[in-house]
């Protein structure tokens, strides 16, 4: 049903009408159809920083110094200026109002990187309930590092990786966690996942999932490490068993002692093989059982042994979605071409409860129907619970099914869709301007996913969803007059405030030229 676009009429309607139960926030978000970032300040004079993102509650704007040594945090404010003449809306903004400082107030600058380290500009996780921020610094990669101490052959090494937990209110460093001669994929926060107060960090080099708890005091506390061992007392049990064997040898009972680094499969790998074997063993037909054991288990046994953990996400406080694949795929920039597997792991029972290949139809249909369960968010975060997905938005579902119908090979389509799993933590913007029930836009040019995209000299249009031919606003990255050199490849990122009609577009080239920052807001 058509609703008026007049803000005053909508305010009166909100006063006299009671929305249906459970729809009050959706009704309130419709006001964003009227309040849009329709005005642009081009090529804003701003600090030479690498801008990261707004926090999910909109209280902070995170950036890093260009030398990747310092964290610089701003408080978003709103433009204020005085006008002596009548009808101020028809005049250009005064020069002072067109600066970065008119929209952002610097709170502090903190040096995070020590000697030899650099801040990973793509890594930032925010704990909204305590207003804590998690950042990462690291030294350079060593690509041909020898696999010592049980490390995986072919995985690079980083001499020092440090995770810093900060209180964003004042920039105080509350705690740090250091990994030496290890490898954690820090790009786009792939190697870490935050769920409420639980933090999972994946060590690719040593194949461990470190589960930590972030206390209200700001302490990082070890909960468990999943990989070589699954239960807290596994290592104690194996060491005590080895001691018994040593005593037997001393008493004349000659047994071959196990080699600590090569005798046993890791705990998580043993759980995986056990799940696959039991699934086949439960086959009622004995002939079918024997054939499946030969074809699906013993024939691929070494392939399963060679799998390594690529990526992890929480499904809830007790279950992890773990992605397995080859060593090459784990460190490759384009892991989509490599076969992979997904396992659901229960941390309390230490059991694998589900296992799928990345081409499994069953997993895809689960993802299509229950996409929101993969994009888990903190219970305390109101803003993250209303992002559009194909399981909660009919327009997103239609777009997905259109893409699926165009696919010539359904198996390849499934693999392409499953490449996004496990989902990266806090990788989507909760801005209402990405709500597909309110606006329609070209997702090839802009979307809620936090990624750089190829820039265009044409404005990106946001069309009203209820009135399909009405342009609500448009955003143009780069200089107002367009690029003078059409051959130079340019990339662009968009940083939307989660609540206010405020966004930044940052256009940069691959030749270390100065970035072009535009501010889009409602005037």
Swiss-Prot record:
One of its GO terms (biological process) is protein ubiquitination. GO terms for molecular function: ubiquitin protein ligase binding; ubiquitin-like ligase-substrate adaptor activity. The keyword Zinc does not apply. It is found in: Nucleus. Signal peptide: none annotated. Keywords: Nucleus, Phytochrome signaling pathway. A motif (Nuclear localization signal) lies at residues 401-416, 472-490. InterPro entries: 6-hairpin_glycosidase_sf, De-etiolated_protein_1_Det1. It comes from the Eukaryota. It holds the Pfam family Det1. GO terms for cellular component: cullin-RING ubiquitin ligase complex; nucleus. Changing residue 498 to S: In hp-2j; induces higher fruit and doliage pigmentation due to higher levels of carotenoids, primarily lycopene, and flavonoids in the mature ripe-red fruit. Probable component of the CDD complex, which probably also contains DDB1. Belongs to the DET1 family. Component of light signal transduction machinery. Involved in fruit pigmentation and fruit nutritional quality. Acts as a negative regulator of fruit pigmentation. Probably acts by participating in the CDD complex, a complex probably required to regulate the activity of ubiquitin conjugating enzymes. Repression of photomorphogenesis is probably mediated by ubiquitination and subsequent degradation of photomorphogenesis-promoting factors such as HY5. This is Light-mediated development protein DET1. It comes from Solanum lycopersicum. The lineage of its organism: Eukaryota, Viridiplantae, Streptophyta, Embryophyta, Tracheophyta.
């Amino acid at each position: 049903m058509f609703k008026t676009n007049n803000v005053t009429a909508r305010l009166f309607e909100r006063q006299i009408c009671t929305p249906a139960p459970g729809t009050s926030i959706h009704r309130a978000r419709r006001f964003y159809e009227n309040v849009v970032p329709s005005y642009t300040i081009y090529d804003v004079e701003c600090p030479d920083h690498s801008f990261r993102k707004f926090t999910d509650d909109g209280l902070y704007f995170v950036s890093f110094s260009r030398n990747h040594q310092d964290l610089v945090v701003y408080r978003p404010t709103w433009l204020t200026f005085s006008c002596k003449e009548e009808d101020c809306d028809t005049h250009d903004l005064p020069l002072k109002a067109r600066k970065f400082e008119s929209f952002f107030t610097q709170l502090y600058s903190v040096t995070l990187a020590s000697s030899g380290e650099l801040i990973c500009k793509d890594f930032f996780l925010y704990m909204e309930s305590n207003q804590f921020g998690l950042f990462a610094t690291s030294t350079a990669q060593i690509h041909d590092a020898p696999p010592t101490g049980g490390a995986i052959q072919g995985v690079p090494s980083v001499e020092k990786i440090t995770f810093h937990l900060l209180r964003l209110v004042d920039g105080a460093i509350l705690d740090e966690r250091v990994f030496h001669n290890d490898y954690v994929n820090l790009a786009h926060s792939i190697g870490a996942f935050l769920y409420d107060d639980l933090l999972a960090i994946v060590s690719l080099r040593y194949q461990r999932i470190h589960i930590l708890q972030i206390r209200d005091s700001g302490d990082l506390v070890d909960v468990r490490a999943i990989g070589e061992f699954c239960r807290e007392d596994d290592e104690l049990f194996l060491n005590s068993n080895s001691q018994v064997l040593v005593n037997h040898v001393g008493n004349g009972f000659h047994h071959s002692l196990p080699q600590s680094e090569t005798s046993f499969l890791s705990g998580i790998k043993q759980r995986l093989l056990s799940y696959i074997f039991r699934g086949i063993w439960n086959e009622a037909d004995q002939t079918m059982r024997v054939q499946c054991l030969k074809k699906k288990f013993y024939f691929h046994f070494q392939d399963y042994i060679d799998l390594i953990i690529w990526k992890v996400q929480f499904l809830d406080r007790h279950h992890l979605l773990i992605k397995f694949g080859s060593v090459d795929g784990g460190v490759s920039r384009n892991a989509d071409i490599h076969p992979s597997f997904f396992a659901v792991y229960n941390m309390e029972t230490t059991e694998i409860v589900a296992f799928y290949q990345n081409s499994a139809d069953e997993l895809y249909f689960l993802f299509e129907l229950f996409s929101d369960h993969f994009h888990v968010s903190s219970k305390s975060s109101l803003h993250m619970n209303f992002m559009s997905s194909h399981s909660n938005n009919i327009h997103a579902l239609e777009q997905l099914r259109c893409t699926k119908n165009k696919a010539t090979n359904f198996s390849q389509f499934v693999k392409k869709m499953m490449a996004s799993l496990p989902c990266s933590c806090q990788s989507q913007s909760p801005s209402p301007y990405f709500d597909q029930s309110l606006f329609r836009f070209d997702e090839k040019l802009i979307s809620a996913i936090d990624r750089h995209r190829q820039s265009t000299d044409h404005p990106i249009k946001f069309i009203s969803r209820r009135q399909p031919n009405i342009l609500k606003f448009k955003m143009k990255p780069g200089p107002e007059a367009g690029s003078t050199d059409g051959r130079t490849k340019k990339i662009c990122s968009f940083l939307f405030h989660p609540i206010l009609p405020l966004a930044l577009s940052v256009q940069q080239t691959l030749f270390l030229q100065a970035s072009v920052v535009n501010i889009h807001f409602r005037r």
